């Protein structure tokens, strides 16, 4: 599939889609560095239409994921932050960037630095829940928020957060 997508038959109109599909195939094959390079190259192309614009947003999400898997958390966060508030992927980005902040928190040496990253993670989840409370990922985001409050030793807030999840799913 990767060879076919890179072939000369791919016209300019489909170039961004082909590069994106190639990067996804590379990532699925475990070739994360190649995928990152393909995604980075994709951002050098001009956006010609609405489809290219959506591919661009998907590219930012994919870059965030690939760089996260490569352990380059700063690059992951930078990629996620390219997604705008009006994007239909905004809630997904906030959920994923939260995990990047958690990962960065776990890499910190001091408790103060860990807490600073956890606060960023909490803020991202809170923005997600306020901006789109009906998002399909809102229940998972609430559970994540509860866990973040546990890590910050905000036990009462964590309990209330978990209770709100239970109440939402009670028959």
Residue ranges and their predicted role:
Residues 1-171:
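Acidic, polar-rich low-complexity tracts and alpha-helical solenoid repeat scaffolds
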């Amino acid at each position: 599939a990767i060879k076919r997508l890179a072939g000369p038959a791919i016209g300019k109109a489909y170039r961004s889609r082909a590069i994106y599909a190639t990067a996804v195939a590379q990532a699925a094959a475990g070739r994360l560095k190649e995928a990152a390079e393909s995604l980075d190259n994709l951002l050098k192309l001009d956006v010609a239409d609405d489809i290219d614009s959506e591919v661009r947003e998907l590219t930012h999400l994919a870059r965030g994921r690939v760089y996260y898997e490569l352990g380059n958390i700063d690059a992951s966060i930078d990629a996620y932050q390219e997604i705008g508030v009006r994007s239909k992927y905004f809630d997904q980005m906030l959920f994923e960037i939260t995990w990047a902040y958690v990962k960065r928190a776990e890499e910190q040496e001091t408790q103060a630095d860990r807490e600073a990253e956890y606060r960023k993670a909490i803020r991202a989840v809170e923005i997600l829940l306020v901006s789109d409370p009906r998002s399909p990922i809102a229940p998972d985001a609430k559970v994540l928020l509860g866990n973040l409050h546990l890590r910050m030793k905000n036990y009462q807030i964590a309990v209330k957060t978990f209770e709100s999840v239970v109440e939402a799913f009670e028959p």
